[in-house]
């Protein structure tokens, strides 16, 4: 009697698939960076584009020398966080998902295309379980 050996590679259902796209956006129109409603709308649309499921979205405006806006979307798959500093014309963007079918890069690229920074950096991290 012969035995067959099967591959023990875990399927996506047997592990967490963590996809993390994050980066820095430089030299953005400071009027965009202070428009809380616009920024919240961009994050909401990015949730849809990335095929994520929104749980809640919150946003805050901060004054002072390092003032700006923070928008955080809690999604079933994880989160999108956008933080701006208008005086520096700078923003950071973090899109993390554990959803197999979600696309954090699409969300990142959508927000970047709408904020139109003169320069940006995008990084990827695989945060999947083993």
Curated annotation (Swiss-Prot):
Binds 1 pyruvoyl group covalently per subunit. Its cofactor is pyruvate. Its EC number is 4.1.1.19. GO terms for molecular function: arginine decarboxylase activity. The modification Pyruvic acid (Ser) is found at residue 78. It comes from the Archaea. GO terms for cellular component: cytosol. Keywords: Autocatalytic cleavage, Decarboxylase, Lyase, Polyamine biosynthesis, Pyruvate, Schiff base, Zymogen. The keyword Lyase applies. Pathway: Amine and polyamine biosynthesis; agmatine biosynthesis; agmatine from L-arginine: step 1/1. One of its GO terms (biological process) is arginine catabolic process. The active site is at 78 (schiff-base intermediate with substrate), 83 (proton acceptor), 98 (proton donor). It catalyses: L-arginine + H(+) = agmatine + CO2. The record marks 77-78 as: Cleavage (non-hydrolytic). It holds the Pfam family AdoMet_dc. Is synthesized initially as an inactive proenzyme. Formation of the active enzyme involves a self-maturation process in which the active site pyruvoyl group is generated from an internal serine residue via an autocatalytic post-translational modification. Two non-identical subunits are generated from the proenzyme in this reaction, and the pyruvate is formed at the N-terminus of the alpha chain, which is derived from the carboxyl end of the proenzyme. Belongs to the prokaryotic AdoMetDC family. Type 1 subfamily. Specifically catalyzes the decarboxylation of L-arginine to agmatine. Has no S-adenosylmethionine decarboxylase (AdoMetDC) activity. PANTHER family: S-ADENOSYLMETHIONINE DECARBOXYLASE PROENZYME (PTHR33866:SF2). Heterooctamer of four alpha and four beta chains arranged as a tetramer of alpha/beta heterodimers. This is Arginine decarboxylase proenzyme.
């Amino acid at each position: 009697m012969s035995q067959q050996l099967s591959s023990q590679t875990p399927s996506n259902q047997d592990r967490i698939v963590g996809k993390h796209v994050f980066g820095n956006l430089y030299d953005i129109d400071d009027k965009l960076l202070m428009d809380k409603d616009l920024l919240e709308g961009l994050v909401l649309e990015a949730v849809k584009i990335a095929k994520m499921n929104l749980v809640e979205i919150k946003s805050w405006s901060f004054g002072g020398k390092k003032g700006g806006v923070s928008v955080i979307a809690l999604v079933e798959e994880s989160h999108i966080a956008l933080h701006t500093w208008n005086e520096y014309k700078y923003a950071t963007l973090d899109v993390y998902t554990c959803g197999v079918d979600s696309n954090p890069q699409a969300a990142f690229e959508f927000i970047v295309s709408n904020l139109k920074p003169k320069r940006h950096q995008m990084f990827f991290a695989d945060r999947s379980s083993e």
